Amino acid sequence: MDVKTYPVLEAAKNRTLLDNATYLEWYRESVADPEKFWGEHGKRIEWFEPYTKVKNTSFEGDVSIKWFEDGLTNVSYNCIDRHLKTHGEKTAIIWEGDNPYLDKKITYNELYDKVCRLANVLKEQGVKKGDRVTIYMPMIPEAAYAMLACARIGAIHSVVFGGFSPEALAGRIVDCESTFVITCDEGVRGGKPVALKENTDTAIDIAARQHVTVSKVLVVRRTGGKVGWAPGRDLWYHQETAAAEPHCPPEKMNAEDPLFILYTSGSTGKPKGVLHTTGGYLVYASMTHQYVFDYQDGDIYWCTADVGWVTGHSYIVYGPLANAATTLMFEGVPNFPDAGRFWEVVDKHKVNIFYTAPTAIRSLMGAGDDFVKRSSRSSLRLLGTVGEPINPEAWEWYYHVVGDERCPVVDTWWQTETGGILITPLPGATDLKPGSATRPFFGVQPQIVDSDGKVVDGAADGNLCITDSWPGQMRTVYGDHERFIQTYFSTYKGKYFTGDGCRRDEDGYYWITGRVDDVLNVSGHRLGTAEVESALVSHNLVSEAAVVGYPHPIKGQGIYCYVSLMAGEVGDDELRQALVKHVRSEIGPIATPDKIQFAPGLPKTRSGKIMRRILRKIAEDDFGSLGDTSTLADPGVVDDLIANRQNRA
């Protein structure tokens, strides 16, 4: 195919931190001598006791990943205290509310006060180093304070996206045996309240039935809405923090002490607790934030993600604050009050760097250029995209219409598991190709492997693996190291398998082609097909379900469900609606099925395995190339599925 290349813009070249020659030199060093390279760059954060060991990692056998392992530091100290002398009065967080008339600015001095008070409240309530604290919050500054307060005292935070259901929240509380929850009376999204405290109460009841008791709930008052209250367990955030001491010494943490657990979808139904540790994670998050976005002092930086996802952890909170940046937190949604909201916020706060997801770009593109054109966007210098591959059409629109052809687009590829960006352009160094994540970041060694496990060189297609560790890499699955090894290191021995398909072109640029396992990427968020299947099957009229992804114009991938009902039951639109509602309540709105096809039978092999390949093809309305169906126990089901498909072109 004919691929357009956009050379590095002169303006980007003139102010960049890294030009192409420097990128190539640093990259060569980082791969040839990672000890030396990261030994130098590890010093970008402050250490209470410096490290003497840099890298101690193995992708073989019991898989062990350690970086800077004898160093002592603290993430909260690095994100706040060390900036106070020179940047105390600088704005750390700009908060933009769901309501366009609501905003506030928090300086680094104020951030210190808020975080120390909250850290002292946690300590007074018995939270100790190593305890797990669940944070179930909307996009308000208190969510960032909560993360930083946990880091300050050595507690491990587990942030759960505010859009998840009580059942999903309970599962995450139980898995890490969390006894302390920080939440909010209600969230606000798109003008509507979100019942976070009510969901928390329900989740705590579910967790109690599984023998995990939450002893304290700290509640932020956001809307003043009426909420249930358990005296002795529930505490008001504003009352407790007002009475707390405004200073709290940071705990000295080993570089390999856990910082947070973040649950992500796997191909089996049970979400995995991805565990990130302290030193390597912060070095990598801050370094990628600085160089990928060409961040320089004074820039206003806005990542539109939610703190409930890894992008919010690394590129709203930890990366930017470690770099003394001004980071914008947005409570709202891109289309409220209308589809011009993002660009109004850019103008209002003079945003220089803007980082969002392809799904938002596609939906705003669909709303038309007028919403963009009524804003000036003259402050913008750099655009970024994250969460899923961006199709070239959306890339071009973003570059030409939003960026007025003067802002490089950094299309970043990474995962919850990687802690930070792995493959990305650098704005002053990399010629851009719409749809390509381009080249690896420092220390990252990608490899393309075919399905037989053979490494393929040059221009090639296959499965994306990484051959050596980098500091931001996850260390284990919380409480289940065996699952960590099985999921990531057993498919291709001695390599980290990303679960993504990938193409490398003749210039060595990488193009991510999407998941190759049973994981969907819906609006840039990962969702295991097994999770959606379990939710469907838990409905009393459903006997079996199979879920696959299909191309969706806005969300990237839509959710297509094949559902077999109990004997004697008949599928109709009313039942479809009921099943949609059921899945939403089991998992959350993010898992809303787009298509439900009632299927008397599913294509199975004689051993009973569902042939998802066939279901994917039918969902994609592409059944001319189904391949050999003779191995199916009942090949006749395929004709029925094709005849009743819900996705006709």
From Swiss-Prot:
Catalyzes the conversion of acetate into acetyl-CoA (AcCoA), an essential intermediate at the junction of anabolic and catabolic pathways. AcsA undergoes a two-step reaction. In the first half reaction, AcsA combines acetate with ATP to form acetyl-adenylate (AcAMP) intermediate. In the second half reaction, it can then transfer the acetyl group from AcAMP to the sulfhydryl group of CoA, forming the product AcCoA. It comes from Rhizobium meliloti (strain 1021). InterPro entries: Ac_CoA_lig (IPR011904), ACAS_N (IPR032387), AMP-bd_C (IPR025110), AMP-bd_C_sf (IPR045851), AMP-binding_CS (IPR020845), AMP-dep_synth/lig_dom (IPR000873), ANL_N_sf (IPR042099). Keywords: Acetylation, ATP-binding, Ligase, Magnesium, Metal-binding, Nucleotide-binding. It is an enzyme of class 6 (ligase). This is Acetyl-coenzyme A synthetase. Mg(2+) binds at V537, H539, V542. Its EC number is 6.2.1.1. CoA binds at R189, G190, G191, K192, T311, N335, S523, R584. Belongs to the ATP-dependent AMP-binding enzyme family. SUPFAM superfamilies: Acetyl-CoA synthetase-like. The keyword Ligase applies. The keyword Metal-binding applies. ATP binds at G387, E388, P389, D411, T412, W413, W414, Q415, T416, D500, R515, R526. It catalyses: acetate + ATP + CoA = acetyl-CoA + AMP + diphosphate. Its cofactor is Mg(2+). It comes from the Bacteria. The modification N6-acetyllysine is found at K609. One of its GO terms (cellular component) is cytosol. One of its GO terms (biological process) is acetyl-CoA biosynthetic process from acetate. One of its GO terms (molecular function) is metal ion binding. Acetylated. Deacetylation by the SIR2-homolog deacetylase activates the enzyme.
